[in-house]
A protein has these predicted regions:
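A short SAM/SAH-binding and catalytic strip from SAM-dependent methyltransferases
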Residues: 98-112
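A short glycine-rich, Lys/Arg-flanked "PGG" loop and its adjoining helix->strand segment in the class I
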Residues: 115-127
Length: 199
């Protein structure tokens, strides 16, 4: 079973499990204007009404995007939805004014593919645009004893999700290598959360 099939399988239960947006995402999006990209949006956990802004949700799971569309309709939020791989985004260069990349980069298999996804994000952001990033932290109490940075984590009986565990320096360097400047870092806990700007 490939990862698209796994996430399609768990989409319904995941949507019920991940209901409320993370507080740090709400704070980051507050007051944002223009086009906002949600990379690896899943079922639309972070979908919200933002005055003077429009959200674009992209995920490689068709089932997740279907659920996100239902959520948007229920909440009466106008948004755009795409089923696409994060290594090949279906958007023009310099299109987005801001982005969120929460708990999805670490789900991409292969170092080259993760690098490509960050480069694609850089391509579609406008100069000066910021992205909030969140990935699992290899050095957190939860994962400190993990023998490998690559893990497959089961979701009940629906399949195993791929995760790559970053350490803080590694993820910061990945974004800097792509041309970003790190402008804010939260103290890493279970998640490494930071804001990067396209310069």
């Amino acid at each position: 079973m490939n990862q698209k099939q796994v996430w399609d399988n768990i989409a319904g239960e995941w949507s019920e499990f991940k209901i409320h947006p993370a507080h740090h995402v709400e704070e980051f999006l507050k007051g944002k204007k223009g086009n906002i990209l949600d990379l690896g949006s899943g079922s639309g956990r972070h979908l919200q009404k933002i005055p003077k802004a429009k959200m674009y949700l992209v995920d490689f799971s068709e089932k997740m995007i279907e659920l996100a569309k239902e959520k948007a309709k229920k909440k009466k939020i106008s948004a755009e939805f795409s089923v696409a791989d994060l290594t090949k985004l279906p958007y023009e260069n310099d299109f987005f004014d801001a982005a969120i990349f929460i708990s999805s980069l670490h789900c991409i298999e292969g170092e080259k593919n993760r690098e490509k996804a960050v480069k694609e994000l850089f391509r579609v952001l406008k100069k000066g645009a910021q992205v909030e990033v969140g990935v699992w932290n290899k050095d957190s109490n939860k994962f400190r004893k993990a023998e490998s940075k690559e893990r497959f984590v089961k979701w009940r009986d629906k399949g195993a999700r791929y995760y790559y565990l970053y350490d803080a320096d590694e993820i910061y360097k990945l974004f800097e290598k792509a041309g970003f400047k790190i402008v804010f870092k939260e103290d890493p806990k279970q998640m490494i959360i930071f804001v990067a700007e396209k310069i």
